[in-house]
Amino acid sequence: VDSEEINHPDEDLELPRLMGIKFAVLLMFGGWGVGFGAAGIASYFLGMQGTTAVGNTVGLCLMTFVGVRFSARPAREVLSLKSFSPWLIPPMVLMAFSGSFLVSEVGNLTEEILPVPQELKKMFLGILQADGVEQFLQRAALLSLMAPVTEELMFRGVIMFGLIRVYGGYRGILISSICFGVFHLIPWQAVGATLIGGLLGVMVYRTGSIFAGMAMHAIWNLFPLIVISAFHDMAPEGYGFDSEKVTHVPIPLLILSGGLFYFAFKRFWKLSAQPNEKGFEIAEGC
């Protein structure tokens, strides 16, 4: 046996590890570049929601296509195109409902450190607040259909599959969730998006189905749209959605939300299969 192989057993592994990170970063930058370019062109013809939809769809879909082509595996394996049990939907809904309060408080703590500019806050509210059924359906299509499909195919599909090939299951999930948070660019969203990305990654890994991630992503995005659209004018003084003051979630509600989330996640874990999706088995074997 060559002595150099004994002295440097990990030398050959360094290149694929570097390529794994580089590949994820290149896909992210490609998604940004193409997305911003497409949104810039669309802005001449469409409003804010339209340009967001075009940029998101074009950028992420193109990078997903590139990622699948370079993965050297069938698209069904890379993207985990497999159904999941409908019995998982109830715990997913409960996780999304309770988890929204927890992640909202993470955002509040972030805002205490780094205040959100009022113009940016108004932009967020403009996306989430719908006046009338037609606007609600438009925003629901963007937040609970288009975004979950394109973002899950990219991050829990191509990127996570590639990272798992290099780093193994849970490290691949962790790195892909960080990429998901960074992709959102805005600091007030990045921390929460990273946490949500980790949860979505675990769900896809446990079930072996990208559709589980899409469903959870859609449910999670739908809750704030419903709440802000329905109760925007009914919030008590000091708790308005456009208030300049950071209002924290009450501690009893946080404790209740934490308990519900733990119960729902435990139920999901029990009902979901172990990570035995063929694509992930091959990925970890590589």
Question: Where are the regions that the model predicts?
Answer:
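Short, Lys/Arg-rich, polar N-terminal cytosolic tail immediately upstream
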Residues: V1-L18
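Hydrophobic alpha-helical transmembrane segments
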Residues: K22-F29, A53-V54, I89-L94, L137, ...
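Alpha-helical transmembrane segments in multi-pass membrane proteins
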Residues: G30-A72, P91
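Functionally important transmembrane alpha-helices
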Residues: G33-G40, S177, Q189-V246
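Juxtamembrane helix-loop-helix connectors linking adjacent transmembrane helices
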Residues: M48, E77-A147, R165, G238-G240, ...
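Structural signal for the C-terminal ends of transmembrane alpha-helices
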Residues: F65-R76, M203-R206, Y262-W269
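Membrane-interface helix/loop boundary segments of multi-pass membrane proteins
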Residues: T150-I175, V202-S209
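C-terminal membrane module of polytopic membrane proteins
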Residues: A218-C286
